[in-house]
Design a protein with these regions (language model features):
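Alpha-helical subdomain
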Residues: 1-114
């Protein structure tokens, strides 16, 4: 989870704590950039390697990455979704962070991206 200090984030954290699910490290890495740096720091590169990480909110992934062959359009046709703004707000508080150790600048995944 990210953005625990905005109004919606505080409400989410409080609701989880009331259910006994305290997010112990949430304030140590509260932003996309902090999550990306955390991943890069965890990936200990050896000589000749490069740590690469990328982080996106789930809302960003839905809006910009889930377009292959009309997948987003197909999903949206399955059920009328009248609460998109609330859903987008919720999804903007979750992220996916991907990291890899690249062997060289010529690595086939040198342009690592989500």
């Amino acid at each position: 989870m990210i953005s625990p200090d905005d109004q919606f984030g505080r409400m989410m954290v409080e609701n989880l704590e009331q259910r006994g699910c305290e997010l112990l490290g949430i304030h140590a890495h509260p932003t996309l950039e902090a999550q990306k740096k955390r991943m890069e720091d965890l990936l200990v590169a050896k000589e000749g390697q490069q740590a690469k990480a990328e982080s996106l909110t789930m809302c960003d992934i839905y809006q910009s990455k889930l377009d292959g062959e009309g997948e987003r359009t197909r999903i949206e046709k399955l059920e009328l979704f009248d609460e998109f703004e609330e859903w987008a707000l919720l999804q903007s508080h979750y992220c996916l962070t991907l990291g890899a150790l690249l062997q060289s600048a010529d690595s086939p995944i040198k342009d690592l991206a989500i």
